[in-house]
Amino acid sequence: MKTVYAGGEGEIVEKKSRFIATVRPVSSEEEAVAFINEMKKKYWDARHNCSAFVIGDRQEISRCSDDGEPAQTAGRPMLDVLLKEEIHNVCVVVTRYFGGTLLGTGGLVRAYQKATQTGLENSVIIDKIGRAHV
């Protein structure tokens, strides 16, 4: 099982729109929501602060938000990256500063996935070994 030991940040630019991915380890839904709200305050002037998180050893809790982007173009693609990478107890917020050019639904999906992947690449991810209870 993989988890985030130390969060990180990654940035990409697509057609003049800036996508800033911030990754943080979390252990509860409340912690994830607090982190999302923290990022919304930090990037209050951004057009969108989309998010996704996975919590639990078996990914028991997973949520995502498009934060005003067209349905299924931001939060779900971000969550798909986390699930594909099998990373647990993590929250990602991707902040978008609109650059004036519409990306279309396919462009948005690719941009949010790429930003999430970049944020993860700039984080410290470890393999967590489960302990057996006897």
Label each residue range with its predicted role.
Residues 105-109:
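Conserved structured catalytic cores and adjacent interaction surfaces
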Residues 46-50, 125-130:
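Flexible, glycine/charged-enriched surface loops at secondary-structure junctions
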Residues 88-98:
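Glycine- and acidic-rich phosphate- and metal-coordinating loops
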Residues 60, 97-100:
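A short, flexible beta-alpha/helix-coil linker loop
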Residues 112-128:
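Long, charge-dense
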Residues 1-73:
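C-terminal regulatory domains involved in ligand/effector binding and gene-expression control
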Residues 132-134:
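Conserved small/polar residues in nucleotide/adenosyl-binding loops
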Residues 70-87:
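Positively charged, aromatic-enriched nucleic acid-contacting surfaces
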